[in-house]
């Protein structure tokens, strides 16, 4: 009996530790719901950016073609922007100027084309499917018209899924530039049925 009693009391501290370990609450981390006030505040800050410029690296990858270029995006108002793609030598491959109701595209031969649908015009002339209307929002870290998105632990856009006319785009936000206020994306990737668009923003200028 004495031996059993000593053995019993010797196990008590270990049993107490195990029990305590089982009752320690597990931290679930901060809530990052799209309805959280932190996200709403960040979203409002982004929506107020009416004029900005960003430049960096562009890649369009599909089974039919691969395009690598430098890009420059200049937004002068919510409905006016300019997209410039240049080759490694600095020569212009494509310049797109969008204004309300009219879009002008200039190719690498200097030929100009005019349309009222920038996305359709780029696809017909270059073969690249680029969701420009949505990209204006996505490049800032805004979800645009889709309610299907998730946030990271800093209440910034992490991933979104956008569906329109039977086409589904998935956008992954891979890195943010925290040297600007509010923080803006520095790397993101768009995927749609075998097509990939990669954007790396080297710099942001907010006006």
Swiss-Prot record:
Membrane topology label: Lipid-anchor
Gene3D superfamilies, alphabetized: Lipoprotein localisation LolA/LolB/LppX
Keywords, in A-Z order: Cell outer membrane, Chaperone, Lipoprotein, Membrane, Palmitate, Protein transport, Signal, Transport
Subcellular location(s) of the protein: Cell outer membrane
Lipidation (S-diacylglycerol cysteine): 22
GO biological process entries: lipoprotein localization to outer membrane; protein transport
InterPro entries: LolA/LolB/LppX, OM_lipoprot_LolB
Record bears the keyword Heme: no
Main localization (coarse): membrane
Superkingdom classification of source: Bacteria
Pfam families: LolB (PF03550)
Keyword Chaperone: yes
Annotated lipid attachment (N-palmitoyl cysteine): 22
GO cellular component: cell outer membrane
Signal peptide: 1-21
Entry function: Plays a critical role in the incorporation of lipoproteins in the outer membrane after they are released by the LolA protein.
HAMAP family: LolB (MF_00233)
Annotated family: Belongs to the LolB family.
Oligomeric and partner information: Monomer.
Name of this protein: Outer-membrane lipoprotein LolB
Source organism of this protein record: Yersinia pseudotuberculosis serotype IB (strain PB1/+)
Gene name, Swiss-Prot/TrEMBL: lolB
């Amino acid at each position: 009996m004495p031996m059993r009693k000593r053995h019993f009391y010797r196990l008590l501290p270990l049993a107490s530790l195990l029990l305590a370990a089982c009752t320690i609450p597990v931290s679930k981390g901060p809530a990052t719901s799209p309805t959280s006030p932190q996200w709403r505040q960040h979203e409002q800050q982004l929506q107020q950016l009416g004029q900005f410029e960003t430049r960096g690296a562009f890649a369009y990858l599909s089974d039919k073609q691969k395009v690598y270029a430098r890009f420059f995006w200049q937004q002068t108002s919510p409905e006016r922007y300019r997209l410039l793609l240049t080759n490694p030598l600095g020569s212009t491959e494509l310049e797109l100027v969008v204004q309300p109701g009219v879009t002008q595209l200039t190719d690498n031969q200097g030929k100009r084309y005019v349309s009222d649908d920038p996305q359709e015009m780029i696809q017909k002339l270059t073969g690249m499917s680029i969701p420009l209307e949505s990209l204006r929002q996505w490049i800032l870290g805004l979800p645009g018209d889709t309610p299907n998105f998730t946030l990271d632990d800093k209440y910034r856009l992490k991933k979104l899924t956008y569906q329109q006319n039977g086409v589904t785009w998935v956008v992954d936000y891979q890195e943010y530039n925290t040297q600007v206020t509010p923080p803006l994306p520095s790397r993101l990737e768009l995927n749609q049925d075998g097509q990939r668009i990669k954007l790396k923003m080297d710099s942001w200028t907010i006006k």
